[in-house]
Amino acid sequence: MVEAFKIIGGKKIAGELKVDGSKNSTLPIMIATLVEKGTYVLRNVPDLRDIRTLVALLESLGLEVEKLDANSYKIINNGLSGAEASYDLVKKMRASFLVMGGMLAIEKRGKVALPGGCAIGARPVDLHLKGFEALGAKINIEHGYVEATTENGLIGGNIVLDFPSVGATENIIMAAVKAKGKTVLENAAKEPEIEDLCNFLIKMGAKISGVGTSRLEIDGVDKLTACEYTIIPDRIVAGTYIIASILFDGSIKVSGIVPEHLSSFLLKLEEMGTKFKIEGDKLEVLTKLSDLKPAKVTTMPHPGFPTDLQSPMMTLMCLVNGTSEIKETIFENRFMHVPELNRMGAKIEIDSSTAKITGVENFSSAEVMASDLRAGASLILAALKANGESLVNRIYHVDRGYENFEEKFKALGANIERIKTEA
């Protein structure tokens, strides 16, 4: 038996949605507690399946993890019990591969299973491994495991990433903070989540300059100090909630946002005719859905339009009069939600990496299946708009990235229920 959402859509929903802490910040920051012994307290941690998966992985490596409340954790690092991350845990989530950088920093070696996770494209770890090699690690891959070893610890080096990979940037930063000498990382990813990781490590005493730019300079230090830290809000959850608000003519206020983390997304929505009122961390939509006009979107590394908001944006474009386009440049296979939206009455055609979306009046209710986390969110939004009963299967994907999704939308008046199904 698996879980699904039964949604009776077409209802009026209104109220306020508060954005949770960032999953994509929490994962690397939790992993960064491997880098130095001590007691850490992390706040604004989202209550998600991926976080629970990571807790099990950290505990398997010898860390003590205590949940203080729904969104706070205490992590005690008294030294690792081993430097091997097994396939059983790593296969559940790609971010698990980030433990390699932390293990190299503290243990000078690491052995990690090649990762599993989402069904979106290849997502190779080659860039991570090139980075480790540039810092003096020897890499050996066999039997589905990557083993990295060093003679006497890592040594600073110059690294140019072929692509600004978020995961590779994070893994290399963690490995380099205690390496001997200076590391220069060019073409680094610039996502807010990278900044958050850097700020956490800087609070611990790491010497990192160029934070928020594509060129990071890291002067290795011998010792860091464990600290308390508050995670930034999740910009992808924020974007999803803002799209929900537009779909319902601005009846949902969104709080807990960082507007500068959403610049390209908000600019694109403004180009489509959306007007906002932003006060501090609160955003209100002042436009009706029917007033929007079509647009073209190309997903890009930050600060461009985020690939993680591509599928929720597509749901919105399905109900905008005229023809819109989305070009996906980050991941292959990231249009798996398209056949499902088409089942709900959308008119979307795919040509290679571009989706052409012709607006329709509304979605029709249907049974659909989430293929990944963001696709799941896009289908739920469509089902909330559609008149009648829809079933969204495989919602375990959604639980990986959205905290208490159904409870939050129920509080707005949505008719959404978690049920068990055979599918």
From Swiss-Prot:
Positions where 2-(S-cysteinyl)pyruvic acid O-phosphothioketal occurs in the chain: C118
Q: Which family does it belong to?
A: Belongs to the EPSP synthase family. MurA subfamily.
Coiled-coil residues are none
User: Corresponding gene?
Assistant: murA
- List positions binding UDP-N-acetyl-alpha-D-glucosamine: R94, R123, P124, V125, D126, L127, D308, I330
The keyword Cell wall biogenesis/degradation appears for this protein:
yes
Instruction: Tell me one GO biological process term.
Output: regulation of cell shape
Q: Does the keyword tRNA-binding apply?
A: no
**Protein keywords:** Cell cycle, Cell division, Cell shape, Cell wall biogenesis/degradation, Cytoplasm, Peptidoglycan synthesis, Pyruvate, Transferase
Q: Lineage from the top down?
A: Bacteria, Fusobacteriati, Fusobacteriota, Fusobacteriia, Fusobacteriales
Q: Which pathway does the record list? A: Cell wall biogenesis; peptidoglycan biosynthesis
Where is it found, in Gene Ontology cellular component terms? cytoplasm
Q: What does this protein do?
A: Cell wall formation. Adds enolpyruvyl to UDP-N-acetylglucosamine.
Q: What is this protein called?
A: UDP-N-acetylglucosamine 1-carboxyvinyltransferase
Which SUPFAM superfamilies does the entry link to? EPT/RTPC-like (SSF55205)
Tell me where it mainly resides. Answer: cytoplasm
Against CDD domains, the record matches this protein to: UdpNAET
**Catalyzes what?**
phosphoenolpyruvate + UDP-N-acetyl-alpha-D-glucosamine = UDP-N-acetyl-3-O-(1-carboxyvinyl)-alpha-D-glucosamine + phosphate
Show the NCBIfam families listed in the entry: murA, PRK09369.1
Its EC number is 2.5.1.7
**What organism is recorded for this protein?**
Fusobacterium nucleatum subsp. nucleatum (strain ATCC 25586 / DSM 15643 / BCRC 10681 / CIP 101130 / JCM 8532 / KCTC 2640 / LMG 13131 / VPI 4355)
- Mention one GO molecular function: UDP-N-acetylglucosamine 1-carboxyvinyltransferase activity
Sequence positions that bind phosphoenolpyruvate: K23, N24
